[in-house]
């Protein structure tokens, strides 16, 4: 991958008419470390904010193991990159099929909910799992 001094150089050289990712690994590492060192709770990366594989790999290499996921596609992406990651299915309205697949196929044990109906759905989709 080619590196550029700054965004202006990139635009002048490539003259892109397509989206271009500008990934700054050191900035990702610095931000990740800041959160880990200053936030008193568990730090989760919300995959929906930037599901780019290179960004996620850099976040993982900086020590993040826990991910806020909102779809099966996000679950699949993270498990492909880091199989032993901890996933939190944070979408508050999920289909039974998505819950079941997340639980049985990908080992997701943490689900967000905001009402009794969603709790019932999670229990049904996981066969009344106790974990």
Mark where each language-model region is.
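A charged N-terminal "starter" segment
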Residues: 1-110, 116-131
């Amino acid at each position: 991958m080619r590196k550029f001094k700054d965004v202006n150089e990139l635009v002048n050289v490539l003259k892109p008419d397509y989206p271009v990712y500008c990934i700054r690994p050191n900035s990702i590492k610095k931000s990740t470390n800041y959160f880990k060192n200053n936030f008193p709770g568990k730090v989760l990366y919300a995959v929906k904010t930037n599901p780019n594989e290179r960004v996620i790999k850099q976040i993982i290499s900086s020590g993040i193991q826990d991910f806020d996921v909102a779809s099966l596609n996000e679950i699949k992406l993270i498990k492909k990159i880091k199989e032993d990651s901890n996933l939190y299915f944070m979408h508050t309205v999920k289909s039974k099929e998505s819950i079941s697949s997340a639980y049985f196929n990908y080992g997701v044990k943490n689900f967000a909910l905001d009402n009794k109906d969603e709790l019932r759905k999670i229990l049904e989709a996981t066969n009344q799992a106790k974990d």
